[in-house]
Amino acid sequence: VTDIEADGPTPLHNSMLSFASVAIEADGTRHGEFEAVLTPRVDRQPNETTMEWWATQPEAYKAATEGAEDPALVMPRFADWVESLPGYKVFAAAPMIFDGLWMDHYLDQFAGTRVLGGPFRTRQIFRGGGVCLYTMAGTLRGAPYLDWGMSKLPAEFYGHIPHTHRAIDDARGFANVLVELFRLSSALPPITGSASDFR
């Protein structure tokens, strides 16, 4: 499970400041953590609105910017770490469209790999399309789409870890959520199909 912090909404114009990942299995078995702070890209600019928000989060911003390293060094190191983990690896985030987008862009740019697994002739460190905790939580709650949201889950699902916007804190909380969601999904009746159903 990965959480990222950035100085704007899009990797096309802004920079990822920090990220953290917790390697965890569906049953809660943990295999380690990875945390990094990245130097902002010289070809990107901070988003004014995002920086105004960061001004209200001084401790989180300090954690997201101190001890920064070149992403060209960090992202290959992260890819190596992912490959060193046991079993097959699946990227998970909340929501996938935000954190996954950033990580996919940086991995592609600096490590020659992707968050997405597929029929690509490149280094592949993850399998499949990944897990969106936002979607998984919303559907398993049985909530209508406009009532989805990670804040709608009880604190127990997070293991009572506060959401601080420090990447490692948030990744740890979301890792606990993932385990709880798999616990819920395991109680559901299976749905089966065949290859001929999908063309």
Where is each model-derived feature located?
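Residue-level signal for well-ordered alpha-helical scaffold segments within enzymatic catalytic domains
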Residues: A26, R77-D80, S84, L101, ...
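Glycine-rich, phosphate-binding/catalytic loops in enzymes
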Residues: M16-A20, L107-A111, S185
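A structural motif
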Residues: E52-P58, A143-K152
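Short, flexible loop segments at boundaries between secondary-structure elements
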Residues: G118-L146
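Substrate-recognition/cap helix-loop segment adjacent to the acidic, metal-dependent catalytic center
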Residues: V82, I97-G128
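Acidic, Mg2+-coordinating catalytic module of metal-dependent nucleases/exonucleases
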Residues: V90-M96, L101-W102, L146-R199
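Conserved non-catalytic scaffold segment of RNase H-like nuclease domains
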Residues: E5-M96
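Short hydrophobic beta-strand that contains or immediately precedes a catalytic carboxylate
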Residues: V1-D3
